[in-house]
Amino acid sequence: MSDLKCPFSGHTGAVTPAGNTNNGDWWPNQINLGILHQHHPASNPLGDAFDYPTAFASLDYSALKADLQTLMTDSQDWWPADWGHYGALFIRLAWHSAGTYRTGDGRGGAGHGNQRFAPLNSWPDNTNLDKARRLLWPIKRKYGNAISWADLIILSGNVALESMGFRTFGFAGGREDIWQPEEDVFWGKETGWLKDERRNDKGELNQPLAAVEMGLIYVNPEGPHGEPDPVASGRDVRETFARMGMTVEETVALVAGGHTFGKCHGAAPDSHLEAEPEGAALHEQGLGWRNTYESGKGEHTITSGIEGAWKPNPTRWDQGYFQMMFTYEWELTKSPAGAWQWTAKDVKPEHMIPDAHVAGKSSAPIMTTADLSLRHDAIMEPVARRFHLDQEAFADAFARAWFKLTHRDLGPRALYLGPDVPEEVQIWQDPVPPVTHPLIDEAEISTLKQQILASGQSVSALVAAAWGSASTFRGSDRRGGANGGRIRLLPQRTWEVNDPEQLNGVLTALETIQSQFNSSSSNGKSVSIADLIVLGGCAAVEKAAADGGHTVVVPFRPGRSDAGPEQTDTASFNVLKPLADGFRNWQRSGLPLRAEELLVDRAQLLTLSAPEMTVLLAGLRVMGANTAGNRQGVFTQNVGVLSNDFCVNLLDMTTRWTPTSEAQDAYIGRDSATGAERWSASRADLVFGSNSQLRAIVEVYAQNDGGSRFVADFVKAWVKVMELDRFDLRS
């Protein structure tokens, strides 16, 4: 039997398909284009016609919340609730779903229900959250597709808080589920759980990571690398929460608010835990961490390894967390599982905490090292003291921070669904003013395009400005984009990648055109700079195509508005500043990643396919949209003309490419017969001739019949990028 091979995988015996070598094993430096095509519609069992906002509108929202409220105290024998209340479990479920978000690239977070899949469903920090999702299954089954898993997980956390006496800030639905693991998220290079190989020479976390160890949401609760040092832990806490966009006040509120409820579980060493869900046996049916200690549940539960509750009344909202923290001195102890924790000394009888499962048993309050960082960190301690003395301020701060935590990656308010959406607008939502005037029509659009082209700005400058405005969009957290016209504001106006001097010329010309149009309009119509920036790019593309012999009309839909400085958090928008933009052949110096990897990463954030990435880069090159007039990759003698010259000349076998340095990040292309220099290129250019998949796409456009297809496909991809943030057009 050992000689028999599976006809599909080629494997013998019991070897798993994962043991098969793939292209990445043979050629580890090969770029991963698969991230551009993940979440293909074919993977979605709901089909292309399913519209989640429509389905959500049919939801009996009040009934759903009532069922969740009932669930909170409906303790199940197979996984008993602590103190008869599941509230803390569902707070942790929601928190750990949202808490993977990081501002560096907008990835992670609660927006897609990715906690259902590897690796998150099997992270050590998510131990036993598989049980929480199974507890939710009867409710998910009842309401079906009217509520996504992603929304249900977050809503369960909100209802949990409300069921224990806390008033939340609100809830918005709109998170659509994915149906396979995300391949684009870099969680770290470590090959073992709870390892830390993610810091630079200064000890700072490498970008875009926001957790201190592989498999953790934030910090090690026992302290950095398991060392119980509250001061050092404070630095980790502040850094990790800042990496997900939280202020110090929000950080303190979240830690204290979340730990107002429930307990830690460390009844015995984790050697009693069997494999996590992804590694568990088939018959476990997706459940992991089977516990062989005693009953394996209830008072015998093992999760973090820390054991105990933070305060009396663990199922009620109150000031107990801060009261315990600042009332008592804390003694370093070890849990039954061997984890470092801190136990209150000389506890008053009224502060002893009844056991979650065993009648007549009680324990002193505990704190983790991370908890005590709120008391010992010089920056967080004053905030914690203030919250201790002002319950109203603490409650308000926690409500707002919880809403921000659980909604940060949902996108703009235009995507919010449901009756509990708060009316108050938050600056972290990147608000744009509503459009309150009639929009320009086709005739006016045509006139404005003529005026823009006659303004003295080149095709290259107009295209670059429009691209710089729209390409800040990130499909990960739906931030950025052209709406709001923030490229005219700080910080974007001064970003090196946007070629500030050239950009200022474009903006000045467009502002003059805007002023003339708006002041002369007799029908109440106005046009925003945000619209004019995009329209200028569209007009330039039309001219570039016409100069190449192709008559095209680039679709343009007005309706963008101009945000002001008061609606723009400069620090928050600085995280959108690209490390590299291969589409403009620009890269910050000193980056460890190769230009082609950064290009694919940026294309994925722009939700582009490999063909879309190819045609856009090739078109932008020949139109001269590189930053600061960089000539790398401009494989044409007719700069400013939209043509397939990049593709044709890249595949020219009479050009011989050689690197110009040992780093092999820049190249010269010479005539193979004469040695005369023809072109210069970056890695982001030559990858389209080197990578077999990208070369196959380039060949389509370089063919004699590929010119018209190239222009048509460029226009289609261009419009897609210009409208990535136009969620108002889809509602």
UniProtKB/Swiss-Prot annotation:
Residues 1-23 are annotated as: Disordered. It catalyses: H2O2 + AH2 = A + 2 H2O; 2 H2O2 = O2 + 2 H2O. There is a cross-link at W95-Y218 (Tryptophyl-tyrosyl-methioninium (Trp-Tyr) (with M-244)). Its cofactor is heme b. It is an enzyme of class 1 (oxidoreductase). The record marks R92 as: Transition state stabilizer. The keyword Nucleus does not apply. Transmembrane segments: none annotated. Binds 1 heme b (iron(II)-protoporphyrin IX) group per dimer. The active site is at H96. GO terms for molecular function: catalase activity; heme binding; metal ion binding. The keyword Metal-binding applies. Signal peptide: none annotated. Pfam families: peroxidase (PF00141). Its EC number is 1.11.1.21. Gene3D superfamilies: 1.10.520.10, Peroxidase, domain 2. Keywords: Heme, Hydrogen peroxide, Iron, Metal-binding, Oxidoreductase, Peroxidase. Formation of the three residue Trp-Tyr-Met cross-link is important for the catalase, but not the peroxidase activity of the enzyme. Homodimer or homotetramer. Bifunctional enzyme with both catalase and broad-spectrum peroxidase activity. Belongs to the peroxidase family. Peroxidase/catalase subfamily. This is Catalase-peroxidase. The lineage of its organism: Bacteria, Bacillati, Cyanobacteriota, Cyanophyceae, Synechococcales.
